Amino acid sequence: MLLALDVGNSAVKAGLFSGDELVRVFSVDPPDADATDASYWRAELDSALADATVEHAGLVSVVPARTDAVARGLRGVVDAPLTIVAPEMALPFTLDYDTPDTLGTDRLAAAAAGWTRYGRDASRSVIVVDAGTAVNYEVVHRTGTYRGGAIGPGAVLMRNALQAGTAQLPDVPLHLPETPVGSSTRTALQSGILWGLIDSVQGMAARLAAQLPDAPRLVLTGGWSNPLIDHLTIEAAHAPHLVLRGVRLLAEKNRA
């Protein structure tokens, strides 16, 4: 089996693949004190992978301080090659990005999976939206060229910024209200954050699409993709775990 790891800002998400089939997904949300402790990751991964035979692993990370700890923890559990995704590896598209050394590898994985699954065979441009802690937009031109995209705040960051930057606005649970007209401070915040996120994604998708020569395929993924797919008024594909699928794809493509 192939193990795909996505070391994110809030948690480490993992997927086990048999061929191209995703057979199991799990996540680990470490306490801050343990996030860079290799022995913690060794214990967590040893438990999670007790019944799995891992023959190859791939990893993307947006938290450099955790990358080495997770990798060392994994190497203490499985005797398998580990491919760490990087912009200089073999990719399913050409990079047209001014600063590839700063390109998040989670973005690269999402774009690779989105292009391969939804755009390449049809020679159709693709826009991937990964809605998590941040909202990442990836643009792949129909010629197979990654053009870049955009990065914005996700729902949790918006809520935290409003709470931290104001004197009286409370912390609120992130539930989408039925109407955008908030009749209380709580529902007004929920509306501004979540309906605002939905409209932001819809507006950005349209702006990015206008830069392309064809009608691109819009693909949604990430932890906040469910309310988006339910409420956008434009057509989109829903592709859960797209980053993990991209990690698998790139690890296989670059397997020694």
Swiss-Prot record:
EC number per UniProt: 2.7.1.33
Cellular-component GO terms for this entry: cytoplasm
GO terms of biological process kind: coenzyme A biosynthetic process
Major localization listed first in the record, in broad terms: cytoplasm
Residues holding ATP: D6, V7, G8, N9, S10, A11, V12, K13, T133
Catalytic activity from the UniProt record: (R)-pantothenate + ATP = (R)-4'-phosphopantothenate + ADP + H(+)
Pathway in which the depicted protein is active: Cofactor biosynthesis; coenzyme A biosynthesis; CoA from (R)-pantothenate: step 1/5
Domain of life where this protein originates: Bacteria
Family matches, as NCBIfam families: baf (TIGR00671)
Record's function text: Catalyzes the phosphorylation of pantothenate (Pan), the first step in CoA biosynthesis.
Family: Belongs to the type III pantothenate kinase family.
Protein name: Type III pantothenate kinase
Species of the source: Salinibacter ruber (strain DSM 13855 / M31)
